[in-house]
């Protein structure tokens, strides 16, 4: 997986690819944090703590959106695909 590090010698990887790796790893971590907070919110019995955990989860969603936007701006193919699929009512799956 991408968060396990580089799969090619670091000297052979461009700065741009290394930055993209950082961004993809960060996006994965933010989405994982959202998942963990969702589970904590579901399991939590204390309503005050549940509200705090939900707030923290939503901040992770903001972080994920920021990183995804950085990726979109840096990668023309992601830009095209995200513009094609996000915020539309068109079919998502290829049928």
Predicted regions and their residues:
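Iron-associated oxidoreductase/ferritin-like identity signal
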Residues: 1-95
């Amino acid at each position: 997986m991408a968060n396990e590090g580089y799969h090619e010698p670091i000297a052979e990887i461009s700065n741009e690819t290394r930055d993209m790796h950082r961004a993809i790893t960060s996006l994965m971590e933010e989405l994982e944090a959202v998942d963990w907070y969702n589970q904590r919110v579901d399991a939590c019995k204390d309503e005050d703590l549940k509200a705090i955990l939900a707030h923290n989860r939503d901040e992770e969603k903001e972080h994920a959106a920021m990183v995804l936007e950085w990726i979109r701006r840096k990668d023309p193919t992601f830009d095209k695909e995200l513009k094609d699929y996000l915020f539309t009512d068109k079919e998502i799956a290829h049928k």
